[in-house]
């Protein structure tokens, strides 16, 4: 099949459904304190040189259970973003302590880190295993390829694919992993060409490659191409799966085609083999919510609850968010309690979703309660949660409470604090408290210099600062602000326009302004030309 003829013309969900890799390998690698490998030999040598060994003392460490070993290993690896260090250092330390590190433990940790959007650390686990000559199955290679695409880019993923042994390369899951990379990176032409190659190899025999393409087109804002792909699937005798139905429904939502949506629901009801999942009804609820059809959304959420595994964390997260979207506060709390009962060890992500739901509902008391509960239990401080609390308090005009959150966070974590400071500065500038905003600006610059805190200037914050300078006719302040901005990126046309407007408002001239614009290669717009007539005559 020629994919180029398949379509004649003309989210988060897209990324979620661009998954192409499957179950872990059956081969199990073990690294422990034994002389069976170079890595293990180094461990033995290190243990022999210890004081206890030199004194002839043989120490005995009780072997941890499989479950406790897995928990401890994942805990240490998941905290690396807070504690610093590398995956290799952590794993080597485990071995030095006499703890066996098994491939299935490592694989489970990598999968979990990947799931929670920590691809760099997940890839480092694979890299560590590869350097120790652990056996990789085809599906291991597929997951590794996916992680390389996420951490090192598409070219590196292609190189990894091309350099694989034929036995690992010429497999449906490996080709599918590269297909996923193309779709995630929105490389339409490469994705179509790769689809054709997979088709020639008889690898397009299920819904997965089609789902990847559909997800890509949704993210390319081309939802009209999704039904065409569904028809092509059916012509091949490939039945839509639950993921297919979800993306297809999402395309109808994007096109405001509620009639088409109802037809899909009817088809799903008649399709005895339709493997609808909780995801299917989650997307249906989201579409109805967007259309303002809250009763239908509520009905879809009830169907979602019937389909979901009561122990599934993700489904609870979606339920809380979607119930908040239709202003069903009591339902949000009910699902939250259900999650805590099913999964007593509530992680940061679950608290994050709950805080987002509280924020969406404008439930300030709920924000305070949930945030306080999280702070008392968390073992890895996550500024994303603090930022939600800060933003919600500011929306409620509770600046002092928001600032207390930042003060507490600075005592308990190393940041980054840039997002929190931006939220506070925007609020202060909007309420004519520029002096306090400037103090936060100075602190933000200091944080960035001392801790290399990444700083992404929002256009809203930049414009608010310049509006303040223009109103105050503060040319010196505007110039100093430009110097600060230039430390992160070259000044652009919009920024220079703000600066020149400040000069004009202050009725001051800048004889070298035209030269500055030329040196910085700023395109002179008509607006700038008019301003220069008075600022740089």
From Swiss-Prot:
GO molecular function: mRNA binding
GO cellular component: mitochondrion
InterPro entries linked: Pentatricopeptide_rpt, TPR-like_helical_dom_sf
Subcellular compartments: Mitochondrion
Ranges occupied by PPR repeats: 171-205, 206-240, 241-275, 277-307, 312-346, 347-377, 382-416
Family to which the UniProt record says this protein belongs: Belongs to the PPR family. P subfamily.
Stated name of the protein: Pentatricopeptide repeat-containing protein At1g02370, mitochondrial
Gene source species: Arabidopsis thaliana
